Amino acid sequence: MKERRQCVFGRLWRWFLTVLGDIKVYRFPRFMVYDPTTFAVKGDDTRDIMDVIAPGDVVLRGYHHYLDGFFIPGDLSHSGIYVGNGTVIHSVAEGVCEIDLIDFFRCDRACVMRPKDGGAAVAAIEKAKSLIGSDYDFNFVDGNGAYYCHEFTATCYSMLGIEKKKTKICGIPLRRRYLGTSFTESDKFEEVIRINC
């Protein structure tokens, strides 16, 4: 019975977090939009990114006014790895998957970070490809074979010793986690391009 309750709770938790990531809230006039389709990063911005991006780059994105932004600190709430051929591997609610670069950058803020060690980029791409199909880590626990987005990216670059950051939600301190700033503030990466951040 306890197992069944945990299973039901787990499914509800996954559904809640998935829906939370698709709701945009406007303060004035006050209204909500589910799964909006307009973003501040436009086609020209994406073309600028495509002109400079290289395989192994860490790609980060963020959104204005999304509910999940209240729970994920920083301007860049999602990350992945550009693996070449116009595709990004990242971890989302459905698990680790490969998507088109243009789809990845349907967002309001964007940043591309390049590892200073080119050899690390090659290893990170191989690791990212090997993790396709892994589950999303809804519990944000290390070492369980599932990955939240920044954990996935940091795992692919584990050879660089990516640093976890202190986090707070509503002023309440939580355990250290990988965040967008784990990459943007790291001396192991250099910024290639930043849009609307």
Where would I find each of the regions flagged by the language model?
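Cysteine-nucleophile amide-bond enzymes
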Residues: 1-197
